[in-house]
Amino acid sequence: MQQLIEEITKEQLRTDLPAFRPGDTLRVHVKVVEGTRERIQIFEGVVIKRRGGGISETFTVRKISYGVGVERTFPVHTPKIANIEVVRHGKVRRAKLYYLRELRGKAARIKEIRR
């Protein structure tokens, strides 16, 4: 039974996404349905966590919008994500960057590394 589940989920996994880690700044292109129309909405921010594995893997992106912190969690393998762009790679020493929630302004910056 477990093999059957693994085979089915393996077909659903996306392979067109770039490699990214917590601390990286992403530009996520999300498909949004409004009535009968479908459009692309861009959500750009810092990856503060990545959890799970396989089909249930998710990541959370945080950005500041008009002075208010906004976090959005996306499943990695969802068809609602049209594209993911890695804007910059950040140098961090933690897997979960929850401490960024308390930091404001320049203190919340993440050092960039060249890859």
Curated annotation (Swiss-Prot):
A single GO BP: translation
Pfam assignment, any one: Ribosomal_L19
GO molecular function: structural constituent of ribosome
A cellular-component GO term for this protein: cytosolic large ribosomal subunit
Source organism superkingdom: Bacteria
Keyword tRNA processing part of the UniProt annotation: no
Record key words, sorted: Ribonucleoprotein, Ribosomal protein
InterPro entries: Ribosomal_bL19, Ribosomal_bL19_CS, Ribosomal_bL19_sf, Translation_prot_SH3-like_sf
Keyword field contains Ribosomal protein: yes
Cited function: This protein is located at the 30S-50S ribosomal subunit interface and may play a role in the structure and function of the aminoacyl-tRNA binding site.
NCBIfam families per UniProt: rplS_bact (TIGR01024)
Similarity comment text for this entry: Belongs to the bacterial ribosomal protein bL19 family.
Protein name, per record: Large ribosomal subunit protein bL19
Annotated organism of origin: Bacillus pumilus (strain SAFR-032)
Source organism phylogeny: Bacteria, Bacillati, Bacillota, Bacilli, Bacillales
